[in-house]
Amino acid sequence: MDEQMNKKYLANKLFETQFALEDLREIVRQSLPTGMSNDQSEHYDEIVSGLGGLLEDLGKKNGQTQPVKIVGDLMCRTREEEFINIQPIQAGGRLTPEARKAVIAYGDGYSTCDNCRKPFRLDKIEKPSISTFHTDLAEFVGMDQARVVPGARRGFQAVASSIIEKGDTVVVSTFAHYTEFLAVEGAGGIVREAPVNEHNILTAESVAHKIDEVKRETGKLPALIMIDHFDYLFCNEHDIYGIGKVAQEYGIPFLYNGAYTVGIMPVNGQKIGADFVVGSGHKSMASAAPSGVLATTEEWADKIFRTTQMVGDVTGRKFGIKEVEFLGCTLMGAPLLSMMASFPHVKERTKHWDEEVKKSNYFINEFLRIEGNEVLSEFPRKHALSKVDTTGSFDKVAKTHKRKGYFFSDELKKRGIAGEFPGATRSWKMSTYGLSWDQIHYLSNSFIEIADKYDININ
């Protein structure tokens, strides 16, 4: 193991080098097709001559460095380079090298639109192969048609706006995300919550009971069922297949919220019994934000992806190819291209979900060796994201430590670990997703080291 490596130093030097290359790129952009001006050529040569020193610095792997500024007070983000990041909503959205390259190449505004031809719609563009990507996305989640959207929430919004009438009821879980509430409210609907059981699991029976309750009280069935496969509070797995059957039995459309599943584990919407599958690109598909996917069946495609029928009264203009719920096109640049660039890796990693769950359980088992530690999520774990409780261990230390709960953040940071909620020593969430086994072992040992340092018993 190369113990001479300084990750902060390397992160800063990498950014310095990348930014020098970007400065060269800007000179090339500003030059005429016939060549550079004398000033441009001189500046270009000056930057190139400095690259040798930067590469030499990178080769050292250690040394003195300063944080790298982008502009003004905007500094480089080096969390992923410097630390093992266990932040629960960032793990699945960590960009692949291919996605980072795509962001560099396609960061300019409407970069997807260089070759937009008739019929002038994002999902019809063939170069780059955005049209094919939409087909592949639908197949990836076991549905018939798909569209990219600016985050899962816009998928909820599109479905809610399409099928909910004012006063309609929508059944969600008591663990539903706030964006589901807002999507229903925006469409004029009313949320009714199906309660989880004593194990914080939503069952098919609970959903059926809530449907019956709504029917008795309103005389109508709910217009939609919208349920998370794994919730954001505990990341417990809910009876999504059973709920899919209930939806089919009652004839109610079912939206599967795959914000924490699509892109990290296998998902087949039609096998689940879903009419709509929504995923998050920036949460679980290694994509830049905002990005997501909405997929549906042929039965619902015409309604959800309906095109405008509006005609201008003076000009007679109409834009029939544009889809109403997406205001025409959705992701016109880096978010979409990052999603496309990561897609081969994302498809492959879903095949190894069992290994991610093994890593999660290995860490949690080691974590539970620390006396007073608890896991609040269902256990054994079925996901890489977990809610844990350290009230009986690290919070006891925090009560008398001069740094209070921040002592724990300090200890983790010293060991190159980030992403826990700063100052939290009671209940908090974390994710091991995407970590290597070496990182899992290091992470586990670090928690035990901290416990040992503060005389907390280790079993």
UniProtKB/Swiss-Prot annotation:
Catalytic activity: O-phospho-L-seryl-tRNA(Cys) + hydrogen sulfide + H(+) = L-cysteinyl-tRNA(Cys) + phosphate
Family annotation (NCBIfam families): PRK09331.1, SepCysS
EC number of the protein: 2.5.1.73
Keywords: Protein biosynthesis, Pyridoxal phosphate, Transferase
Function as written in the Swiss-Prot or TrEMBL entry: Converts O-phospho-L-seryl-tRNA(Cys) (Sep-tRNA(Cys)) to L-cysteinyl-tRNA(Cys) (Cys-tRNA(Cys)).
SUPFAM superfamilies (alphabetical): PLP-dependent transferases
UniProt-recorded name of the protein: O-phospho-L-seryl-tRNA:Cys-tRNA synthase 1
Assembly and binders: Homodimer. Interacts with SepRS.
Residues binding pyridoxal 5'-phosphate: A152, R153, N257, S280, G281, H282
